[in-house]
Amino acid sequence: MAWLGVAVGVLLLVTAAVTAAGWRGDAGSSTASTPSDSVLSHVHGLGVNPADGQLYVATHHGVFRLSGAQATRVGNGRQDTMGFTVTGPDEFLASGHPAPGEDGPRHLGLIRSTDAGRTWQSLSLAGQADFHLLRFSRGVVYGLDSTSGALMASSDRVSWQTRSTVEAYDLAIDPHRPDTLLATTEQGMRRSTDGGRTWEPAGGPPAVLLHWSPRELVAVTADGTLVRSVDGAATWSSTAGRAPGAPVALTVHENVVYLATEEGRVLRSADAGATWQPMMP
């Protein structure tokens, strides 16, 4: 119960920040409202590509690759890339909105890249769904549609089932059991063991971001504290460190934690959140 009394006001602030971070981009030339090809703005998602070991950042203005201390826009796409997940070597799934001036539907539905974000193809739900969260495990894709609040699932990336309605900051899937999900919500963490059809309180910390790897479950609270669980969220441990800034995106790869903040900073921690280092100057 001690967890539940922490950071409620900060959670509301994070909700407002996430809601304010909408979709923009430009497939053509840069405009005054579009950042340069090396500037991150409104980060929505993070993922490490197994093909090159590099961190990819989904933003308000396309997808960037972080290599060393440099961010480089991948391809010419400047779509507002909201939902984002890496599903395999050079394969990404995403959603969102086209850049201003681009042809096509207002909502991208599910799109896929098989060349590490250089080009994208529409797979399903174009014009119908705007997934602000996408998660993948063992062949199942889960998407949280911002237009309806529906949690949807697909095993072929074409046909979808609506499982429930849930207001979540983030979702994580058990890497061994794709029907087991955790969601971070304003009411606390919630768990589903039937593929998102029903939910129950899961206890635990007042987290906003989640990442579930085969090794452990990692969560970040609204004040930037990193907590970990090695028993499927039954118990949690935390470190003394705290990430600077309001957290908006999280991923973990080979024991390195990557975190993006509302200010557009991307940080890394190799000591479970005890200390954080910026990835760009």
What are these regions (language model features)?
Residues 15-38:
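C-terminal region of N-terminal signal peptides and the immediate post-cleavage residues
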Residues 35-64, 76-85:
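Beta-strand-rich domains and repeat architectures in extracellular enzymes and scaffolds
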Residues 44-47, 85, 135, 172-174, ...:
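Conserved beta-strand position repeated across blades of beta-propeller domains
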Residues 51-53, 89-90, 138-139, 178-179, ...:
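Short coil/turn segments that connect the beta-strands within blades of beta-propeller domains
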Residues 57, 94-95, 143, 183, ...:
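Residue position within the beta-strands of beta-propeller blades
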Residues 62-74, 107-124, 152-163, 190-201, ...:
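Asp-box/BNR beta-propeller loop motif
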Residues 77-82, 126-131, 165-171, 204-209, ...:
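Short coil/turn segments at the loop-to-beta-strand junctions that recur within blades
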Residues 101-107, 144-147, 183-184, 221-222:
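Short, solvent-exposed loop/turn segments at conserved positions within beta-propeller repeat blades
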